[in-house]
């Protein structure tokens, strides 16, 4: 069985990136929660 984590910068950005988060209402909720928590990094 192959390892499940096959890193790809493009996929990472498209799925978990800042612009991907901003594109949906729920994504914006994620960012606001992370801001409220005081995260140094909001998204990938």
Curated annotation (Swiss-Prot):
Gene name, per UniProt, is rpmH
Molecular functions per Gene Ontology: structural constituent of ribosome
Write the protein's name. Answer: Large ribosomal subunit protein bL34
Swiss-Prot/TrEMBL keywords: Ribonucleoprotein, Ribosomal protein
This protein's source sits in the domain of life called Bacteria
Q: Kindly list the biological process annotations in GO that this record carries.
A: translation
Give yes or no: UniProt keyword Ribonucleoprotein.
Answer: yes
Annotated source species: Marinobacter nauticus (strain ATCC 700491 / DSM 11845 / VT8)
**Family per UniProt?**
Belongs to the bacterial ribosomal protein bL34 family.
Alphabetical list of InterPro entries matching this protein: Ribosomal_bL34 (IPR000271), Ribosomal_bL34_CS (IPR020939)
């Amino acid at each position: 069985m192959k390892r499940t984590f096959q890193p790809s910068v493009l996929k990472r950005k498209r799925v978990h990136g800042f612009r991907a988060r901003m594109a949906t209402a729920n994504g914006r909720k994620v960012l606001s929660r992370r801001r409220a928590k005081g995260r140094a990094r909001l998204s990938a």
